[in-house]
Amino acid sequence: MLQPKRTRFRKQFKGRIHGVSKGGTDLNFGAYGLKAVEPERITARQIEAARRAITRYMKRSGRVWIRIFPDLPVTSKPTEVRMGKGKGGVEYWAARVAPGRIIFEIDGVLEDVAREALRLGAAKLPIKTRFIQRLAE
């Protein structure tokens, strides 16, 4: 699963996702992509599950690019622990995804294969997404 090799600080604030994505809104690598429509935190496990679903449907043909990276440590305290005594330990890593952000890109497969593969991948994610494709040049 994806996570940073090292970070400056072990823990971060929750933060909020305001407005639309500033960058990463256009297809840079592949011909087809999956674009976020709503804001949400996506965990490293969800990204990996979606990636596996996409590559499995494509039968290892073509190429997949993951355009988001889980760099946000999410902490939680153990169950039945009283309030206070500091912040909990890091449980998992997540990526903040704003509307308009490209999550996955695909190339080297037909459009109907790409559409179905990304539909299966989108089912593993907690947000609404949209299938997009590069305009014919």
Curated annotation (Swiss-Prot):
GO molecular function terms attached to this record: rRNA binding; structural constituent of ribosome; tRNA binding
Gene Ontology BP terms: translation
One CC-aspect GO term: cytosolic large ribosomal subunit
Gene3D superfamilies registered for this protein in UniProt: Ribosomal protein L10e/L16
Coiled coil location: none
Highest taxon listed in the record's lineage: Bacteria
One Pfam family matching this protein: Ribosomal_L16
CDD domains xref list: Ribosomal_L16_L10e
PROSITE patterns tied to this protein: RIBOSOMAL_L16_1, RIBOSOMAL_L16_2
Entry keyword annotation includes Methyltransferase: no
Subunit: Part of the 50S ribosomal subunit.
Its job: Binds 23S rRNA and is also seen to make contacts with the A and possibly P site tRNAs.
Similarity field: Belongs to the universal ribosomal protein uL16 family.
PANTHER family for this protein: 50S/60S RIBOSOMAL PROTEIN L16 (PTHR12220), LARGE RIBOSOMAL SUBUNIT PROTEIN UL16M (PTHR12220:SF13)
Name listed for the protein in its UniProt record: Large ribosomal subunit protein uL16
Species this chain originates from: Bartonella quintana (strain Toulouse)
Gene that encodes the chain: rplP
